[in-house]
Structure formats: C-alpha cells, structure tokens
Amino acid sequence: MDDFISISLLSLAMLVGCYVAGIIPLAVNFSEDRLKLVTVLGAGLLCGTALAVIVPEGVHALYEDILEDPEAARSSNSKITTTLGLVVHAAADGVALGAAASTSQTSVQLIVFVAIMLHKAPAAFGLVSFLMHAGLERNRIRKHLLVFALAAPVMSMVTYLGLSKSSKEALSEVNATGVAMLFSAGTFLYVATVHVLPEVGGIGHSHKLDATGGRGLSRLEVAALVLGCLIPLILSVGHQH
C-alpha cells in the first residue's frame, strides 16, 4: 500500500509539472522570430536533457563498472509525428518509474523520478513551442500537451499494477528501468534532430528549400540551441547517484 501511495503521488506530480511547463509558451505572445528562437531553445533542451541527464542515468542503471556499447537502432519510417515520438518517450518514462516503484526501494524511486522530471518539463516546453511554430491551433496544442502529460503517469500506474511478483523480479534482472530511460533518450534525440531542427532551419523532411531559402539557423538561434543544451547540464551538476 505504501508503494501504491508513493507511485500515485509521483505520477500526479509528473502530470501537473509537465502540463504547467508546457503551458508557459502558450501563455506568452511571441512574434514569429521570437517563436522560432524559443523553438530552437526547446530543441536544445531536448538534446541537452537526452545527453546530459537521461543517458547517464540510464547507463548507470544498467552498468556500474563496465560500460558496453549498445547497438544503434534505425527506423525506416520517418513519418512519425513529433507528438507521437514524445508520447512514446513519455510512456517509456512511465515504464521506468513503474519498474522502479516495483522494487520497493524509495531511493531508486526518487532517483528515477528526479531524472524524469529534469527532462519532462523541457520536453513539454519543446513540444508546445514546436507545435506553435508549426501553426497548430491552441486548443489542439493543449490536447497534444495533455496526451503527452498523461502518458508517463498512466504507464507508470499500469506497469506497477500490472506486474506480478515474478514479473517484477524478471524486470529487475534485466534492468528495465535503465533500458526504458535509454529508449526515451533515443526518442528525444530523434524528435529534436529529425523533426524540430530541420523544421525551424527551413528544411523539411523532403530536404527541399522552403520560401526562406533554407538558410538554416542564424547566429542567435545557434546560441539559443547551445544554451538549451547547456541548461540541463548545469541543472544536473551536483546530482549524485
């Protein structure tokens, strides 16, 4: 019962924190140039959180002494949407938290929760800013944000409640928490580099130049991208395993 209350509170905190972070870009009126700058910053946050927060946490959960090189998985289908990619990522986060809760170790639960929250907020911010840049209606953006915010809490509860004792032991043996977090890091990098950056840089998935000539990113936008990558690194300084 204590574990159930714990996972319920953590899931609720994830839902509220993620939705509030995503609402921020909607609450401010941006000009077209400023919106593009914010979108680039969001892409930087996605890359930074994947490389500085999620990957280290996932690797640490898998290995303590020896690091092995995992095989890189390639997808032949590039038609996946940004929202779907991040929802899949959020679902993986939920599995990670649900698996951590099943261990009945409070310290493990808190470490995974902190790691997830460090990148859930930037992910929500990046998703909403990209959808705004793409010209989606605000009501539809809120629906996309709600689906994204619900994915991790729902999956964490489903994972926790749906596992039998033997299944929990099996997940512990294969380090399900670490695997799920590394999978979510991959979806972050995919969305940021395949969807967001090509879109704001003026080059779509067809790799043809748009009306702006496909000029790429300006110096200010590159600076925003770098800043977005550095913010998660700075926030994670001092976070000990």
From Swiss-Prot:
One Gene Ontology MF term: G protein-coupled receptor activity
Compartments in which it is found: Golgi apparatus, trans-Golgi network membrane; Cell membrane; Cytoplasm, Perinuclear region; Mitochondrion
Keyword Transmembrane helix among record annotations: yes
GO cellular component: mitochondrial membrane; mitochondrion; nucleus; perinuclear region of cytoplasm; plasma membrane; trans-Golgi network
Keyword Transferase: no
Entry-listed glycosylation sites: N29, N175
Similarity section: Belongs to the ZIP transporter (TC 2.A.5) family.
Listed name of the protein: Zinc transporter ZIP9
Organism in which the protein naturally occurs: Pongo abelii
Gene: SLC39A9
